[in-house]
From Swiss-Prot:
EC number: 2.7.7.8
Stated name of the protein: Polyribonucleotide nucleotidyltransferase
Cofactor(s) in the UniProt record: Mg(2+)
Keywords, in A-Z order: Cytoplasm, Magnesium, Metal-binding, Nucleotidyltransferase, RNA-binding, Transferase
Locations listed in the record: Cytoplasm
Length: 721
């Protein structure tokens, strides 16, 4: 078997491409490699057309643990349902590819990216996006490409192209920029409160690199002798479109200008007009051109009616500067926010509403053992902040089965999670595991940004000391020729009929998350820059409204939340606390009814619903790890009697032995003649032997006083009730 090997030198690295060797029955296939990361990306188109009004595109990303030299856990030792990470990468591939296929295409297309080997220095996701473009070009599928993606990081003042996982963690920015020859088509970013200007410069830096990869793909096609298939729109019978334009333009236009109408009223009136048109056409003679045309395609009337509505709405925005609800282009919908709306058995709760979009967010405080273990190719082994987003059918007035979260719900949850993560307190300050759930109760655009706002409010209500509150808004765009209008806080119909959905989240200081999706084939950086700048006053306005509901963390936690104490011990003494076979730590947890977690670095976290019990456990652990020195005097309690002496607890959990010869200046025949179990005595540390055993004495020690137990200084991370 022979294939063609080519390479691209990019940012000082070699990207290796192998074509014509793998997956010979796929429409197009490429093995794309950089470092030790290898992905096989395929693109296949069927000739079977779907009777749908959308492009039936499926993008899948598969990663098997053998790519990192690991065997899956679980009884079956086999990969199961794709992890969340795989779903997010599949979406990352889908989002820049979808707008580059012609809107009229109805052929089934499937792109599959399989990670066969993973190098931690070379993340697989952006390679998969670029590989999807190459595979599609090789399959000769009509496509407004080439398209490519790069990741940009920021360490200090320097932008880094395609940083490693470690560099991403160290830096203040993680942004993926995807683009076509016409401009940027997708952005996905997380940032540490980065300024708008720095963010714009990062996008510009990324698109310059994208342009290099686009040229490299064009050269690859020339080398392989493949001519790119440019989309050629098929001729359609315009009779129905002409009929609708003549008969429906005026009534639709009147509806779109009823600015005081609710969404429901507007939708009902538009549906009524569409139904009247359907009835008129159905009443025509069987040989009428319109009836023949619509009988062959039952969805044609709905599709063309939607196109006309879209055209009129866009024209109103471009020519009159007015939106369907009467707002100006830069106006935010009415906002209401409230915190603490549920009983305190829910640790934190909030309700955020913007227009008809309403989100209920809840926060649960968990212990370190509640962290999510990651069994995928992500170098991180656990997550301590989880955001789950739910979109039930009733939120849009529909009915459908409620099953497991779909790709959209996973993606929106990840976006909200990314927006909040930079402002979370450090684990030494607040070592709780946090789970936020955002329930979309009503949807009319920008529910993910509603989730960001609701999350901030519920976290503050739970008493989480955020570094700063976060708000978010969705920006839209209408582009007709050279005319461009940017919309602030888009609602559902503007998202559906517009050209861009650009979500911007951040604090007063700067941006924490971006997500931009397009329905056109690209936008210049200048337009993206304008949208980012216009989002700032909207974000700050929303933030002001949120702070009217709650502007700082609650001073006390819910009485039903666990209480945590966090402190540090010498890592070399972790074994002392755990004890042989875990007996010591098990004894402490059983005695105090607490949960104890110890990290390799020596950070101990004690969880309990009883603050006094947590303090008792801390005293025991600090007693076990406190270094005892010869000559120190301690008050103690006799815990055991043996023939040759008595054991005395001098610190919580730490015992020493008084040999029978050290019980008194005089000769002692029986230990019980001097002390009994439970007696309080004062002892001096006589010696610590080579095995670390503490030998004590009562000789020469006054028994009417002495040192008291040393009181450890607790470092509580939450108020103790």
């Amino acid at each position: 078997m022979e294939g063609k090997n080519t390479s691209i030198t990019f940012d000082g690295r070699e990207i290796r491409l192998t074509t014509g060797l793998y997956a010979p029955q796929a429409g197009g296939a490429v093995m794309i490699e950089c470092g030790d990361t290898s992905l096989l990306v395929t693109a296949t188109k069927t000739t079977k057309k779907q009777a749908a009004d959308f492009l039936p595109l499926i993008c899948d990303y598969e990663e098997k643990l053998y790519a990192a030299g690991r065997i899956p856990g679980g009884f079956m030792r086999r990969e199961g349902r794709p992890p969340e990470r795989a779903t997010l990468i599949a979406r990352l591939i889908d989002r820049p590819m979808r707008p580059l296929f012609p809107s009229w295409m109805r052929d089934e297309i499937q792109i599959v990216a399989s990670c066969l080997s993973l190098d931690e220095r070379v993340p697989a996701d952006v390679l998969g996006v670029t590989g999807a473009s190459i595979a599609t070009l090789l399959a000769e599928i009509p496509f407004y490409g080439p398209m490519a993606a790069v990741r940009v990081g920021l360490i200090g003042d320097d932008f880094i192209l395609n940083p490693s996982y470690r560099e991403i963690e160290k830096g203040d920015l993680d942004i993926v920029v995807a683009g076509s020859p016409e401009g940027i088509v997708m952005i996905e970013a997380g940032a540490n409160q980065l300024s708008e200007q720095d963010t714009i410069e990062a996008i510009d830096f990324g698109y310059e690199a994208v342009s290099e990869l686009i040229k490299a793909q064009e050269n690859l096609l020339k080398d392989l002798g493949i001519k790119q298939v440019k989309p050629l729109e098929p001729e359609e019978d315009k009779a129905l479109a002409t009929y609708l334009e003549k008969n429906c333009t005026k009534p639709i236009d009147l509806i779109l200008k009823k600015f005081d109408q609710s969404k429901e009223e507007r939708d009902l009136e538009l549906d009524k007009i569409e139904l009247e048109v359907q009835t008129k056409i159905d009443s025509l003679k069987d040989d009428n051109q319109l009836k023949v045309l619509t009988s062959e395609n039952e969805k044609l009337i709905h599709s063309d009616f939607k196109k006309l509505t879209k055209k009129l709405m866009r024209s109103q925005i471009i020519n009159e500067g007015k939106r369907v609800d009467g707002r100006d282009l830069d106006e935010v919908r009415k906002i209401s926010a409230s915190a603490g709306i549920l009983p305190k058995r829910v640790h934190g709760s909030a309700l955020f509403q913007r227009g008809l979009t309403q989100v209920l967010s809840t926060t649960t405080l968990g212990t370190p053992s509640d962290a999510q273990e990651m069994d995928d190719l992500n170098p991180s082994t656990e997550k301590t902040y989880l955001h789950h987003y739910n979109f039930p059918p009733y939120s849009v007035g529909e009915t459908r089965p409620m099953r497991t979260p779909g790709r959209r719900e996973i993606g929106h949850g990840a976006l909200a999670e990314r927006a909040i993560t930079p402002v979370l307190p450090g684990k030494e300050t607040f070592p709780y595991v946090l789970r936020v759930v955002s329930e979309v109760l009503s949807s009319n655009g920008s529910t993910s940004m509603g989730s960001v706002c609701g999350s901030t409010l519920s976290l503050l209500d739970a008493g989480v000391p955020l570094k700063a509150p976060v708000s978010g808004t969705a920006m839209g765009l209408i582009k007709e020729g050279k005319e461009v209008r940017i919309l602030t806080d888009i609602q559902g119909i503007e998202d559906f009929l517009g050209d861009m959905d650009f979500k911007v989240a951040g604090t007063e200081k700067g941006i924490t998350a971006l997500q931009m999706d397009m329905k056109i084939t690209g936008l210049p950086v200048s337009v993206i820059s304008d949208a980012i700048k216009k989002a700032r006053p909207a974000r700050l306005h929303i933030l002001e409204k949120m702070q009217e509901a709650i502007d700082k963390p609650q001073e006390s936690l819910s009485p039903h939340a666990p209480r945590l104490l966090s402190f540090r011990i010498d890592p070399e003494l972790i074994g002392t606390v755990i004890g042989p076979g875990g007996r010591t730590i098990k004894g402490i947890t059983e005695r105090t009814n607490t949960k104890i977690d110890i990290e390799d670095g020596g950070i101990v976290t004690i969880a309990s619903h009883d603050g006094a019990a947590a303090e008792e456990a801390q005293k025991i652990i600090e007693g076990l790890t406190r270094k005892v020195h010869e000559g120190e005097i301690f008050p103690g309690v006799v815990t055991r009697i043996i023939p040759i002496g008595a054991f005395v607890e001098i610190l919580p959990g730490k015992e020493g032995m008084v040999h029978i010869s050290q019980l008194s200046e005089a000769r002692v025949e029986r230990v019980e003649d001097v002390v009994r179990q439970g007696d309080e005595v004062t002892v001096r540390v006589r010696e610590i032997d080579s095995r670390g055993r503490i030998n004590l004495t009562l000789r020469g020690v006054a028994q009417n006083g002495g040192m008291s137990y040393p009181e450890p200084t607790p470092t509580p991370v939450a108020p103790l009730n």
